[in-house]
Amino acid sequence: MRPLILLFLCQIFLLSCTDPKGPSVDDIAGQYVRLVLEIGQYDSDFVDAYYGPEEWKPTGTKGENLPAEDFLARGSSLLSQCHEVDTSGFTRLDHARLIMLQKQLIAVNTKVEMMGGKVYTFDDEAKLLYDAEPPHYSDVHFDSLLSNLDGVLPGEGDLSVRYNAFINQFIIPVEKLDTVFKVAITEARRRTNRHIKLPENEDFVLEYVTDKSWSGYNYYQGKSRSLIQINTDLPIFIQRAIDLACHEGYPGHHVFNVLLERTLVDSLGWKEFSVYPLFSPQSLIAEGSANYGIDVAFPGDERIKFEKEVLFPLAGLDVSGADKYYQVMGLMENLNYAGNEAARMYLNGEISREEAAGWLEKYQLSAPERALQRTRFMDQYRSYVINYNLGKDIVAHYVEFQGGTQDNPGKRWKIFKELLSYPRTAESLVADSVE
């Protein structure tokens, strides 16, 4: 009888030591951050930003080979722990946090598998990494769009040659790049700060670089500071000044990271947002909101007015052809998804690099050197390309569905700010954009 009593008492003791509520999200988040930072040692593109505790950074020398099995086991364990979290008493925001963490972990595991040699189709990769399903378009769709351009562009003959000859009139001279960009940035910041109160110490350093596969990049450094780099490998057209000022700065990546740091990391203590794994659902929101933010900051004709009255003269460009230029650029926007199709076929092994570049030359009217630069981007970032156009469409539809239309700019800014301040994924935005 005595052994049975002792066994019963031991069981009671063990049960009393077990946390009835399961693992905490904070504990899972801390392990997640450490895991992401360790994986980042094996892929320099993986960690886009980190401004969390210094002691969480990996110490010592990394192993010679990727410890994929260890990383996958840890990622899977954290996912299992997420499912064991006691969510009774959770607010809607708490639920959003947990869902976001789960989707980020799925993306982390997927990326580790890819680093280890696993190959996904373009669509599967996009779904697992970015929580989105990219649409498909045929060449017939793009052919019909090109016919609209044919009637607008001056001259006769090859459409790509005519297009590039026309837009080359609107290149910012190299010696005027810095002046034009800084004026565009100042105006973008002024417009953003009217609706989103930014910290007094927020700022970024602007650098001009070469030999990159991208046109611009924001490296967020924490404490409301960023490093923004602009690639000058290829000529930069006048509309790119506002594009990059908004996308990389205000109200794009810089503001997005400032708000996440202030709202989630500093105020709520959610440390998982102090690390940004690039190949994750967070990127679709980041890139989509950065592109949509251009329209939020410079709605309708306001952008054209500012560019014609301020930036064109600063760049020394003839404003007489501006209206035709904007008409052409508006039609070109409809061809955005042609780049996704080129990437899908190329990454699925259906076409070669040269054929992908040829597709871009035909359906995005890219100059040969620009088309080849884009294939370098596909090599480096793969299905990430969907985040710019599909991301923008998802964000735009969500904001406008919630009432943030162009004729209600105050509400548009309010919804946009909320979107930048809280955990959201593509799937959650789509779900909240239907009747």
Predicted regions and their residues:
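Bacterial Sec-dependent N-terminal signal peptides
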Residues: 1-23
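N-terminal maturation segment of proteins
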Residues: 17-435
